[in-house]
């Protein structure tokens, strides 16, 4: 990994916002898919772990990108009512959300989504400048020649991690300086306004500000946590980082028994099992895929880079 990373830096990597790569949905004549999924389909909401992470660090996205609850939410146990537009409300991963995709059928439709004003014109990133900087920050932390220090790439990555189309960059820039000075997290408690689960104190115990006195593990947690946020809403890459490093820290997943039965309670899915009804594809899976996987074709089986071992 070190050899390839250093070769990549020598040959040239993304060094500016202008060099990052992405697809612009509106230019191609269609809406940003996350806007369609959240607003049109009513099929997705912010996770409670992401809510807690952003709120614990007082991230700029909590001020403008993530919407507050869109309607009243009534606690099924106490009858208490959370008024509309009161707070950011996420859903615990693994929650049985129930049927219905309208607010009249399902109160979870009122949980927090993303403000389409800031997302609709944003690109679907393929390679993001900030992601490259966080990769270089981790490499430098490991002692690799990345062309600069871990602190330099970490801080530049945060400054260029915004999701927005250029006309909205000022929203992020107005807040990022104070954000980068945060040394300790806010003592945040995540609460489900419907009363379906217990209150969960934040598992985020790091700040944002770089500190050379931190251990390598804490520095890595800071780098990957900021990288995870910067990747939003590219969930595939963020999921990869979470599995590879264990960061950012997230709430335990609920109802893991609803998977294929291989995931221990509270753990996350390590991979998506192969699915095929084609005889030739099934033959290839059995003959080459399973041996290469090194384990059963289950959700809990780790891929070769997802090692259950210390990061250092």
Predicted regions and their residues:
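C-terminal functional modules
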Residues: 162, 166-312
């Amino acid at each position: 990994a070190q050899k390839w990373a250093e070769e990549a830096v020598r040959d040239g990597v993304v060094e500016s916002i202008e060099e990052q790569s992405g697809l612009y949905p509106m230019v191609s004549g269609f809406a940003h898919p996350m806007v369609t999924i959240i607003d049109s389909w009513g099929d997705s909401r912010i996770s409670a772990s992401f809510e807690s992470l952003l709120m614990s660090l007082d991230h700029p996205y909590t001020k403008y990108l993530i919407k507050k609850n869109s309607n009243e939410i009534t606690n099924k146990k106490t009858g208490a009512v959370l008024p509309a537009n009161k707070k950011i409300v996420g859903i615990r991963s693994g929650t049985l959300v129930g049927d219905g995709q309208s607010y009249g059928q399902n109160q979870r439709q009122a949980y927090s989504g993303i403000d389409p004003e800031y997302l609709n014109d944003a690109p679907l990133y393929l390679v993001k400048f900030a992601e490259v900087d966080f990769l270089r920050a981790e490499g430098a932390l490991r002692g690799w020649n990345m062309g600069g220090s871990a602190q330099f790439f970490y801080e530049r990555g945060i400054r260029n991690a915004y999701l927005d189309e250029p006309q909205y960059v000022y929203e992020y820039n107005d807040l990022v300086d104070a954000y980068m000075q945060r040394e300790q997290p806010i003592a945040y408690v995540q609460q489900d306004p419907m009363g379906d689960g217990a209150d969960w104190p934040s598992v985020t115990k790091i700040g944002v500000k770089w500190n050379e006195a931190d251990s390598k593990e804490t520095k890595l947690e800071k780098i990957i946590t900021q990288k995870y946020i910067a990747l939003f809403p590219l969930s595939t890459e963020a999921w990869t980082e979470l599995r590879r490093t264990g960061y950012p820290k997230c709430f335990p997943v609920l109802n893991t028994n609803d998977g294929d039965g291989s995931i221990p309670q509270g753990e996350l899915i390590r991979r998506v099992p192969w699915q095929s009804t084609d005889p030739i594809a099934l033959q290839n899976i059995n003959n080459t895929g399973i041996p290469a996987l090194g384990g059963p074709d289950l959700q809990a089986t780790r891929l070769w880079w997802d090692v259950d071992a210390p990061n250092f």
